[in-house]
């Protein structure tokens, strides 16, 4: 597993992550294991707003979507510490939040971290999940029930799209 950091990113990341520093054509971090690559684009709130207003953010997201299969948009910092918030430009930051919500729903997962330290923790966590083969796998825990009939309903409800009520009509 290799974590690569774009050479334009702050030296903080190179000093606090086990990584290679090199120019990356898209994204700010790449997590690679075998043929799989996860691209992480990092933005502070102010940077995200400026990029969004100049339409660069949409272009960056489009390039990542076209060229990679796994990707994340990471927004770093707190809204309250952004220049927009300090200047009481709440409408602009709300508009950006709506755009990010839409992107998260329609195009790219959006992750929020509170600081560079938190970003490093998230990247280490994501790297570990990728390395363990757990990235993009969600496993629901089963509940132990006494009735054998209820046990089958519970097992069936683990299938995506099947609720307990639906499993009762099926079995």
Where are these regions (language model features)?
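Short hydrophobic beta-strand segments
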Residues: 1-8
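Short N-terminal binding/cap micro-motifs at the start of the first secondary-structure element
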Residues: 10-15
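Extended, alpha-helix-rich binding/interface surfaces that flank or overlap catalytic cores
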Residues: 20-158
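C-terminal active-site rim and adjoining tail of enzyme catalytic domains
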Residues: 170-171
